[in-house]
């Protein structure tokens, strides 16, 4: 929407200090636009959208985090994420990963779902690794019938509670 983008710090202590806005939503809420007005073609109106979502690295080694997990999963690649805006409920399809058993990566896994709630999952992060990872830029944000390319990145992190494959 012609507004220069700026850093929008998403989550600090599990609260959004600044929400992504386009010109219209910023005016409605009486705040400054953040440069998040995006559209997939000139035929569509800009709407507030994600651009690049990233989680800062922590100070632990990935191997140290894995070694502290008795039973869990390590997700290497996921896709087809969906989020219910407002409630924050999400689901992601795991393309590849591993079981974690007694602190070690064991059996390969694939074709399972991870289901959770965004704010709760953020609150349940107990460890964050120092290994920055950025995706290859193949994500798409779908909203109001539009699709826009987005990117994301994060280090390895331990989320203590999520639903996996429909079971707790």
Annotate each predicted stretch with a short phrase.
Residues 4-168:
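N-terminal small-residue-enriched
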């Amino acid at each position: 929407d012609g507004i220069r983008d700026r850093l929008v710090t998403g989550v600090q202590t599990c609260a959004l200090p600044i929400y992504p806005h386009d010109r219209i939503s910023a005016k409605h809420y009486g705040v400054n636009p953040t440069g998040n007005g995006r559209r997939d073609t000139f035929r569509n109106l800009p709407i507030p959208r994600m651009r690049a979502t990233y989680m800062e690295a922590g100070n632990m080694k990935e191997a140290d985090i894995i070694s502290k997990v008795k039973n869990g999963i390590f997700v290497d690649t996921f896709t087809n994420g969906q989020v219910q805006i407002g409630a924050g409920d999400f689901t992601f399809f795991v393309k590849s990963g591993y079981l974690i058993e007694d602190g070690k990566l064991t059996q390969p896994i694939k074709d399972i779902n991870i289901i959770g709630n965004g704010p709760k999952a953020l609150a349940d992060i107990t460890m964050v690794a120092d290994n920055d990872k950025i995706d290859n830029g193949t994500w798409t944000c779908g909203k109001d019938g539009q699709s826009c390319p987005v990117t994301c990145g994060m280090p390895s992190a331990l989320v203590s509670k999520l639903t996996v494959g429909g079971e707790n």
